[in-house]
């Protein structure tokens, strides 16, 4: 029996885990090495800093990410509460002012009487549990060594890439139109249309641009969900036109037709002064980014306030290491959470932290940790990452394909997802502690 939970890592997962444990009366030590020691991608000491995008993805139940958010809200998620307060326009997606979001999460956790935030790097795993390790995709080398020595497991490496951000005032709006695909949502996106000649010139510049070199000790394994735009382009001349530059559902008012290709810009802060290039995560050198991306209509004079960056992402072989409760096999007092487990995405990481916070509290009190029901978004995601049949193991976003199928076939995808969501929420809302009941 214990009244304390130790959490290593103050990202989305660690922050949510700390909140869940503290609201259940536990004394929480939350260890975060920033700002004294920054990662290659972080730039502040804020807890829950967003580094890849300001979007928390779809908020509608038509998308499984929306279902996961709905379950988290029911469970009293801090990340969902703060995201709602910091929301910026993004159509049917949930996007936030990233600085306001992280600063609010930090202020709330630092002010909580049951939480002590310690700004130091942890280089060894404490042997007095329960302990939650939520050090994220940029786990420090010292902690990687500690984990490897402790678990004996092999680690896999792949790359995440962050998209550039430009100032709104530097854009040429005579070459840009507002709108969302198929008219869904408000006119929350800025669209930069390209004709065939413009696209081909942009494509050639992109695939021949100079990239930042990767570290020799890291094999180049790229996760599809955050692939650098130049890597995607190298697959073929039309790959981008069927990916982030797809024009479907967008009509250029200047021509009355769909463009040959389009680059979308999404608002990045509440003031509307910054926009990020949607789907344009990149590892190009900074000078090359200016040269290549200024070929996009509307961006010829763009001011880049942040260039795209490339960083290593670390995750464990969860099917070998973890139980669905997020406990390490053979070490029931040790929990892992967040992207370190192989979940991919902001919301997935926070959801993972939510479960870890609940279960670490239960373990501390001598209670049996819980497994979220498999027909819920939380349960389906954790089942996937801990299923030993997944070989080789790859990171995964939440999606409806992870949930158990319906007993009867429904051909219409939207209707099928609606039924899956209704079933999941009914089960989640009666699941006891996870549901907030």
From Swiss-Prot:
Keywords: Cytoplasm, FAD, Flavoprotein, Methyltransferase, NAD, NADP, Transferase, tRNA processing. InterPro entries: FAD/NAD-bd_sf, MnmG-rel, MnmG_N, TrmFO. Its EC number is 2.1.1.74. Its main location: cytoplasm. It is found in: Cytoplasm. GO terms for molecular function: flavin adenine dinucleotide binding; tRNA (uracil(54)-C5)-methyltransferase activity, 5,10-methylenetetrahydrofolate-dependent. It catalyses: uridine(54) in tRNA + (6R)-5,10-methylene-5,6,7,8-tetrahydrofolate + NADH + H(+) = 5-methyluridine(54) in tRNA + (6S)-5,6,7,8-tetrahydrofolate + NAD(+); uridine(54) in tRNA + (6R)-5,10-methylene-5,6,7,8-tetrahydrofolate + NADPH + H(+) = 5-methyluridine(54) in tRNA + (6S)-5,6,7,8-tetrahydrofolate + NADP(+). Pfam families: GIDA. Its cofactor is FAD. Coiled coil: none annotated. One of its GO terms (biological process) is tRNA wobble uridine modification. FAD binds at residues 9-14. HAMAP family: TrmFO. PANTHER family: GLUCOSE INHIBITED DIVISION PROTEIN A (PTHR11806), METHYLENETETRAHYDROFOLATE--TRNA-(URACIL-5-)-METHYLTRANSFERASE TRMFO (PTHR11806:SF2). Catalyzes the folate-dependent formation of 5-methyl-uridine at position 54 (M-5-U54) in all tRNAs. This is Methylenetetrahydrofolate--tRNA-(uracil-5-)-methyltransferase TrmFO. It comes from Moorella thermoacetica (strain ATCC 39073 / JCM 9320).
């Amino acid at each position: 029996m214990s009244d304390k939970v130790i959490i290593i890592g103050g990202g989305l997962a660690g922050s949510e885990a700390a909140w869940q444990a503290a609201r259940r009366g536990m004394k929480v030590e939350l260890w975060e090495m920033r700002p004294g020691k920054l990662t290659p991608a972080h730039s502040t000491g804020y807890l829950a800093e967003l580094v890849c995008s300001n979007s928390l993805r779809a908020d509608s139940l038509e998308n499984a990410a929306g279902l996961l958010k709905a379950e988290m809200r029911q469970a009293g998620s801090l990340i969902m509460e703060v995201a709602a307060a910091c929301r910026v326009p993004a159509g049917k997606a949930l996007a936030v002012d990233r600085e306001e979001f992280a600063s609010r999460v930090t202020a709330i956790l630092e002010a909580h009487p049951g939480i002590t935030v310690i700004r130091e790097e942890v280089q060894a795993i404490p042997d007095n549990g329960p302990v939650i390790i939520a050090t994220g995709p940029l786990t420090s080398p010292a902690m990687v060594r500690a984990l490897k020595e402790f678990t004996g497991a092999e680690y896999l490496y792949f790359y995440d890439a962050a998209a550039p951000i430009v100032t709104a005032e530097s854009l040429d709006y005579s070459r840009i139109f507002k709108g969302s695909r198929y008219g869904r949502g408000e006119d929350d996106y800025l669209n930069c249309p390209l004709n065939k000649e413009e696209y081909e010139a942009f494509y050639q510049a992109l695939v021949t641009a100079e990239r930042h070199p990767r570290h020799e000790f890291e094999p180049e394994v790229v996760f599809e969900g955050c692939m650098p735009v130049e890597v995607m382009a190298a697959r073929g001349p039309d790959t981008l036109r069927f990916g982030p530059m797809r024009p479907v559902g967008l009509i250029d008012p200047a021509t009355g037709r769909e463009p040959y290709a389009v680059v979308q810009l999404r608002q990045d802060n509440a003031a509307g002064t910054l926009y990020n290039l949607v789907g344009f995560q990149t590892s190009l050198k900074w000078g090359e980014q200016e040269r290549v991306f200024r070929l996009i209509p509307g961006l010829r004079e763009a001011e880049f306030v942040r260039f795209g960056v490339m960083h290593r992402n670390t995750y464990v072989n969860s099917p070998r290491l973890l139980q669905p409760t997020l406990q390490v096999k053979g070490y029931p007092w040790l929990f892992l959470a967040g992207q370190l487990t192989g979940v991919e995405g902001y919301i997935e990481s926070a959801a993972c932290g939510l479960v870890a916070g609940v279960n670490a509290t239960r373990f501390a009190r001598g209670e049996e940790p819980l497994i979220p029901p498999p027909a819920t978004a939380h349960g389906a995601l954790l089942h996937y990452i801990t299923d030993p049949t997944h070989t080789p193991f790859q990171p995964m976003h939440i999606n409806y394909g992870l949930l158990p199928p319906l007993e009867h076939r429904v051909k219409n995808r939207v209707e099928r997802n609606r039924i899956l969501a209704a079933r999941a929420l009914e089960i989640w809302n009666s699941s006891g502690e996870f549901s907030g009941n």
